[in-house]
A protein has these predicted regions:
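Active-site-proximal cap/loop segments of hydrolase catalytic domains
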Residues: 1-114
Length: 114
């Protein structure tokens, strides 16, 4: 667990805890989506959205979680905008694209019941 070494991650330790502290690190791993992906669990298809230029939550978090899902055979979708920032949108066109992707995903899940 290295969120505190990437970009603004160190500023989150006051709110979330210090992963290097044995007690806090154990708790953080217990609630970490990445650390709790189970190959035997049947998850719904997850949609990861991130931005290459996110300076608050490093895109490596989404990348490595998607990779773990892939390695374990879970279905997922992944979209990484190369511009933008924390909101994954650099301008109105990119915002519209991201919202269209999100709404399409949601509507398909509601329609298909999966």
């Amino acid at each position: 667990m290295r969120f505190h070494t990437l970009l603004a991650g160190a500023s989150w330790m006051g709110e979330y805890g210090n992963p290097e502290d044995p007690v806090e690190g154990k708790f953080l791993r217990s609630i970490s989506p990445y650390h709790n992906i189970n190959p035997k669990t049947d998850y719904p298809e997850v949609f990861f959205i991130t931005s290459t230029k996110d300076d608050r939550v490093h895109p490596a978090h989404a990348r490595k979680t998607a990779k773990r899902m892939e390695d374990q055979g879970h279905d997922f979708l992944y979209y990484e905008n190369i511009d933008g920032g924390h909101s994954a949108a650099a301008n109105l066109k990119e915002t519209a694209k991201r919202l269209a992707l999100q709404h399409t995903y949601l509507m398909q899940k509601l329609r298909d019941g999966k």
